[in-house]
Amino acid sequence: MTRRYWNINLEEMMEAGVHFGHGIKKWNPRMAPYIYANRKGIHITNLTKTARFLAEACDLVFDAASRGRQFLIVGTKKQAAALVARAAIKARCHYVNKKWLGGMLTNWSTTETRLHQFRDLRTEQKTGRLNRLPKRDAAILKRQLSHLQTYLGGIKYMTGLPDIVIILDQQEEYTALRECITLGIPTICLIDTDCDPDLADLPIPANDDAMASIRLILNKLVFAICEGRSSSIRNP
């Protein structure tokens, strides 16, 4: 895998609060190699290691994108929902930014059936066929469509399991992470000081609570994916 320059700046990461971890009482000892210090009862993440792992992740997604691989971005925190959707759409990735439905990946046949139903309902809505149904029937189907849009809207074009899953909060998205582990799908995870780095294929030690931190990490990964996709177009 070729190493590239991704303009990862330690000062920029400090300004975004990437280095702030959790209180020392709320930590996972397996994170010790990634912790630089304890300041006023708060663990401080070693940003040099963050930069190294983030660069590795950018190299990985660039190479994967240049080979046409499919990505799924998972971040269901309410405050990050819009950010996740924008970033994923920009990089032409699938995403889940509401609730993770258990079995979304491990029970793919059921998810696929729901997606077919979702696409059919969208077609019926676009062609106006829903409005030609009796009001009660139309109302029921519109509620179904709204529900499917909320939870499956970000994966509506997904036709198979993703090649790489990017997880923005290991604790919050634990079910998604376990499904990836079960299926052997590689994961890139933001890991705060209360996380288990051994569960991720490629961990990025970083603050997973601050929006500025999440935005910075996600923007770097999305930029690398976009560059990889452009590379495949330039060099088919």
Swiss-Prot record:
> Mind telling me which GO cellular component terms the entry cites?
chloroplast; mitochondrial small ribosomal subunit
Please verify whether the record's keywords include Chloroplast: yes
Q: Where in the cell is it found?
A: Plastid, Chloroplast
Q: Which UniProt keywords apply?
A: Chloroplast, Plastid, Ribonucleoprotein, Ribosomal protein
Q: Report the Gene3D superfamilies cross-referenced here.
A: Glucose-6-phosphate isomerase like protein, domain 1, Helix hairpin bin
Keyword Transmembrane helix, does the record have it?
A: no
HAMAP family the UniProt entry points to:
Ribosomal_uS2_B
Q: What is this protein called?
A: Small ribosomal subunit protein uS2c
Q: What is the originating organism of this protein?
A: Oenothera argillicola
